[in-house]
Amino acid sequence: MGKAKKTRKFGLVKRTLNTKKDQRLKKNQENIKTKEDPELTRNIPQVSSALFFQYNQAIKPPYQVLIDTNFINFSIQKKVDIVRGMMDCLLAKCNPLITDCVMAELEKLGPKYRIALKLARDPRIKRLSCSHKGTYADDCLVHRVLQHKCYIVATNDAGLKQRIRKIPGIPLMSVGGHAYVIEKLPDVF
């Protein structure tokens, strides 16, 4: 008969409690309670009085449409007239608006986008002045929409669309196919 093989037994170390992280100890429970401050108030933004059951009553014809840089570029690619396309999409009169930041962004893009710049200088498109520093158009549009919820935002930028979707009651317009598409416009009118 052979000898029975004796293998070494691993992991026979006695377990000890970690007193710093063990939640069963009284002093650690007290530390957890002190971290939870009952006076901590949640920061809830003030909801506009124009919003009634998720419909923005401030948006009515003639619609004020804020235009982004890439919306103009996509309109040129798809050969859609901006003012006529907006009126066909919304079935009402609309006022296309462009901010100084969007114009500055178009000017920075250089001669490749000169047709878009020429289209943005169209007299039918009204120009809004900006009083803030910097020329980042996305931040400018989001800031303007947060101040006054009476605009429709026209953009094809996915990042800007995500930011605008977080703001309740603001419709989005984008270029889809060879026409404009609107999101979240109430059927009240």
Swiss-Prot record:
KW rRNA processing (keyword) present: yes
Residue ranges occupied by any PINc domain in the UniProt entry: 63-162
Family matches, as InterPro entries: Fcf1/Utp23 (IPR006984), Fcf1_PIN (IPR037503), PIN-like_dom_sf (IPR029060), PIN_dom (IPR002716)
GO term, biological process aspect, one: endonucleolytic cleavage in 5'-ETS of tricistronic rRNA transcript (SSU-rRNA, 5.8S rRNA, LSU-rRNA)
One of the record's GO cellular component terms: nucleoplasm
Principal location listed in the UniProt entry: nucleus
Molecular-function annotations in GO: RNA endonuclease activity
Keywords: Nucleus, Ribosome biogenesis, rRNA processing
Gene3D superfamilies (UniProt xref): 5'-nuclease (3.40.50.1010)
Cellular compartments annotated: Nucleus, Nucleolus
Claim: Nucleus is one of the keywords in the record: yes
Family statement: Belongs to the UTP23/FCF1 family. FCF1 subfamily.
PANTHER family in the cross-refs: RRNA-PROCESSING PROTEIN UTP23 HOMOLOG
Functional note: Essential protein involved in pre-rRNA processing and 40S ribosomal subunit assembly. Required for the early cleavage steps of 35S rRNA at the A(0), A(1), and A(2) sites.
Record text on subunit structure and interactions: Interacts with FAF1.
Protein name: rRNA-processing protein FCF1
